[in-house]
């Protein structure tokens, strides 16, 4: 992958970067963890960033724990009042895609209680009884028993869909927080030839949803993220400009002299 310089050095020195305030950008697509928040903490300058970007801002995240409503509520508590329809999340969109493809087909969903409830509200049949599909999300309750059940379902012919491929994301302290990709690695350590379909970044699905809702095209959209392998590779594949930032330093420096 091409390694682009981030927009801010670890010691806080700014680098030259694309002007996020330029009117050319009809949509600013932004990653969540490491860019706007870290866990339950809003990063420096992000409230001002969100106010300045306004209606051009779309969150495109490999979050596979929350529904748009649950994440929207958390963000509002952090002073980030971003409308739920602007939160495009890998887990929620994986659930939505399956509910639209075959709503009556049973799906074994390994995910948070929030996402399971979201799937049921969309009419998806969540069941481990002869499912057509196994949907793997960031299930913090994932354990040996869950791994055995997944392996049995795949052996029986179920399709494997993975919300997001990230192995981890950095905590505010810099330590890795396990992600869905780590759970996938456990499956693939036993079934190395297992085929699977990814919904989240770097695949185009989330980017396409954001552009459709924004009513724009890739050449008029800018992706901001801290992960070259997901944010950067996904943007590159669509011909979209990408601006890489250092994880957990916030986005206030991107505003330059803009006032809020």
Segments from the language model and where they lie:
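Asp-based, Mg2+/Mn2+-dependent phosphohydrolase catalytic module
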Residues: 1-52, 58, 64, 68-86, ...
